[in-house]
A protein has these predicted regions:
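Terminal low-complexity tails and localization/encapsulation signals of metabolic enzymes
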Residues: 1-38, 70, 74, 124-147
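Alpha-helix N-cap/helix-start motif
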Residues: 19, 46, 83, 101, ...
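Glycine-rich loop-to-alpha-helix module at the N-terminal edge of alpha/beta enzyme cores
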Residues: 33-122, 133
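Histidine- and aromatic-rich ligand-binding microenvironments
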Residues: 10-11, 25-28, 34-47, 196-201, ...
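Glycine-rich, flexible loop/turn motifs
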Residues: 5-7, 11-12, 22-23, 34, ...
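Rossmann-like NAD(P) dinucleotide-binding subdomain of oxidoreductase/dehydrogenase enzymes
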Residues: 124-217
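Conserved beta-strand positions that form and line the central face of beta-propeller blades
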Residues: 25, 37, 89, 100, ...
Length: 217
C-alpha cells in the first residue's frame, strides 16, 4: 500500500517542512481512502505566515499596479498549464464531477486575468471641495496584510477570489484552505513558487479553523 503524500505549508517564499507530530488525513469522499496528509497547523504557524506577509507588503505595494498585474497573469498562465492536474485534484478530494471541476479551474484563471485588467483602472480621485478654489486629491493605499479562510465547496476559485484583488491593490495575503480540500491549494502554491512571486506576498498555511484559522481571523 502506498503511503499518502505529506504536504508542507508555504511560508515566506518556501515550502516549510512540518516539525510537529500531528497530521490531518485528507479523504476521498467517494472511496473513503486517505489520499494525502496535511500538518495540523497551529496559531504559531499562522503567525509566522502573517509576519512574512507583513515584511513583504511595503515593497510589494511600492510596485506599480501594472507590474503587480503582470504577476497575476503569470499565475493564471500557470493554472492553465496545469488545468488537468488541478481539476483531477478537485474531483479526488472534493467529490465534484469532472466537468464542474474543469469549469472551476478555467473560471479561476479567467478571474485572475480579469482582476489584472483593473490595474489600468485602479486610480485616485480629484474631488471638488466645499470651499471655492479648492480640490481634494484622494490617493488609494493598501490595507496591508489580508487573510483568506476558505470553505471546501469551491476551494480553488476562492483562492483567487481572495488573492487577486488583494495583490492587485498592493496587499499581501495568507490563505488557509479547508482541511477537507487542501490539495488543490498546494498545487496553487507550487505555481506561485514556480513563477518566482516575491517571497512573503502569498503564503499558505494548513490546519484546522479553530487553531490556525482563529489566528488569521
Amino acid at each position: 500500500m502506498s503511503v499518502p503524500v505529506q504536504h508542507p505549508m508555504y511560508i515566506d517564499g518556501q515550502f516549510v517542512t512540518w516539525r510537529g507530530d500531528a497530521w490531518i488525513d485528507v479523504v476521498n469522499p467517494a472511496t473513503e481512502a486517505v489520499i494525502s496528509r496535511i500538518p495540523d497547523g497551529q496559531a504559531e504557524d499562522a503567525r509566522k505566515a502573517i509576519d512574512a506577509a507583513e515584511r513583504a507588503q511595503p515593497e510589494w505595494e511600492a510596485l506599480p499596479a501594472i507590474e503587480r498585474a503582470s504577476w497575476l497573469r503569470k499565475i493564471s498562465a500557470g493554472i492553465r498549464e496545469r488545468a488537468s492536474e488541478i481539476s483531477a485534484l478537485i474531483v479526488e478530494e472534493g467529490g465534484k464531477i469532472q466537468q464542474l471541476a474543469e469549469v472551476e479551474v478555467a473560471f479561476t484563471a479567467d478571474y485572475i486575468d480579469y482582476m489584472a485588467e483593473w490595474a489600468r483602472r485602479y486610480e485616485g480621485e480629484i474631488i471638488q471641495s466645499d470651499r471655492p478654489g479648492e480640490n481634494i486629491l484622494l490617493f488609494k493605499r493598501a490595507l496591508g496584510v489580508t487573510t483568506g479562510i476558505l470553505p471546501w465547496n469551491f476551494p480553488f476559485f476562492l483562492i483567487a477570489r481572495k488573492m487577486a484583488p488583494a495583490l492587485l491593490t498592493g496587499n499581501t495575503i495568507v490563505i488557509k484552505p479547508s482541511e477537507f480540500t487542501p490539495n488543490n491549494a498546494i498545487a496553487f502554491a507550487k505555481i506561485v513558487d514556480e513563477i518566482g512571486l516575491p517571497r512573503g506576498v502569498f503564503n499558505l498555511v494548513l490546519g484546522r479553523g479553530e487553531t490556525g484559522g482563529q489566528e488569521l481571523a
